[in-house]
Amino acid sequence: MRVRNRKGATELLEAHPQYVILNPADAKGRWQEIFGNDHPIHVEVGSGKGAFVSGMAKANPEINYIGIDIQKSVLSYALDKVLATDVPNIKLLWVDGSDLTDYFEEGEIDRLYLNFSDPWPKKRHEKRRLTYQSFLATYQQILPENGEIHFKTDNRGLFEYSLVSFSQYGMKLKGVWLDLHASDFEDNVLTEYEQKFANKGQVIYRVEAAFE
């Protein structure tokens, strides 16, 4: 999600260390200590303006959430939502999420969310897709045995590619939704993109895949 630079975004992020972890590499292996409990930890890569991760944190107080985004302006808007939600079970990271092993130990997180990732449709950019095999190998390191990836997209090509990638990696497809909003799936929390697409009547695809 590209947005204009927000004046004062850096200062806003730095002013709220209770939510924004500015040196997450130093937190590697210490996330339970940082949250102050041993609750499960769920991570969203590419949190955008934070509607999903803040909504999930509010709905599930027994789970700790971490939202990651590389764009400081975008993350500052996510922080606005977190401050408005006023829940303790959420942290934000202003980092590149391409190698999550920089910030998490083996098996340290319990679930990963990939919502409306860049589809990188050109074949020469395949390795940049967040469901490419090398990314899956990284995710497997930081997730436990049977750890899950929950994936949503509006892009049919990325959806089909990801189904194949998950399967070829040996993951179990626990659930596949060809039209999420027309299904009986409960407790769906929308992202900003998802709300926009839903308003236009676009189909949303969803997958739950688990490592074995």
Swiss-Prot record:
<comment type="function">
    <text>Catalyzes the formation of N(7)-methylguanine at position 46 (m7G46) in tRNA.</text>
</comment>
<feature type="region of interest" description="Interaction with RNA">
    <location>
        <begin position="124"/>
        <end position="129"/>
    </location>
</feature>
<dbReference type="Pfam" id="PF02390">
    <property type="entry name" value="Methyltransf_4"/>
</dbReference>
<keyword id="KW-0489">Methyltransferase</keyword>
<feature type="active site">
    <location>
        <position position="118"/>
    </location>
</feature>
<keyword id="KW-0808">Transferase</keyword>
<dbReference type="GO" id="GO:0043527">
    <property type="term" value="C:tRNA methyltransferase complex"/>
</dbReference>
<feature type="binding site">
    <location>
        <position position="44"/>
    </location>
    <ligand>
        <name>S-adenosyl-L-methionine</name>
    </ligand>
</feature>
<feature type="binding site">
    <location>
        <position position="122"/>
    </location>
    <ligand>
        <name>substrate</name>
    </ligand>
</feature>
<feature type="binding site">
    <location>
        <begin position="191"/>
        <end position="194"/>
    </location>
    <ligand>
        <name>substrate</name>
    </ligand>
</feature>
<feature type="binding site">
    <location>
        <position position="118"/>
    </location>
    <ligand>
        <name>S-adenosyl-L-methionine</name>
    </ligand>
</feature>
<feature type="binding site">
    <location>
        <position position="69"/>
    </location>
    <ligand>
        <name>S-adenosyl-L-methionine</name>
    </ligand>
</feature>
<feature type="binding site">
    <location>
        <position position="154"/>
    </location>
    <ligand>
        <name>substrate</name>
    </ligand>
</feature>
<protein>
    <recommendedName>
        <fullName>tRNA (guanine-N(7)-)-methyltransferase</fullName>
        <ecNumber>2.1.1.33</ecNumber>
    </recommendedName>
</protein>
<dbReference type="GO" id="GO:0008176">
    <property type="term" value="F:tRNA (guanine(46)-N7)-methyltransferase activity"/>
</dbReference>
<comment type="pathway">
    <text>tRNA modification; N(7)-methylguanine-tRNA biosynthesis.</text>
</comment>
<keyword id="KW-0819">tRNA processing</keyword>
<dbReference type="InterPro" id="IPR029063">
    <property type="entry name" value="SAM-dependent_MTases_sf"/>
</dbReference>
<dbReference type="InterPro" id="IPR055361">
    <property type="entry name" value="tRNA_methyltr_TrmB_bact"/>
</dbReference>
<dbReference type="InterPro" id="IPR003358">
    <property type="entry name" value="tRNA_(Gua-N-7)_MeTrfase_Trmb"/>
</dbReference>
<comment type="similarity">
    <text>Belongs to the class I-like SAM-binding methyltransferase superfamily. TrmB family.</text>
</comment>
<keyword id="KW-0949">S-adenosyl-L-methionine</keyword>
<feature type="binding site">
    <location>
        <position position="96"/>
    </location>
    <ligand>
        <name>S-adenosyl-L-methionine</name>
    </ligand>
</feature>
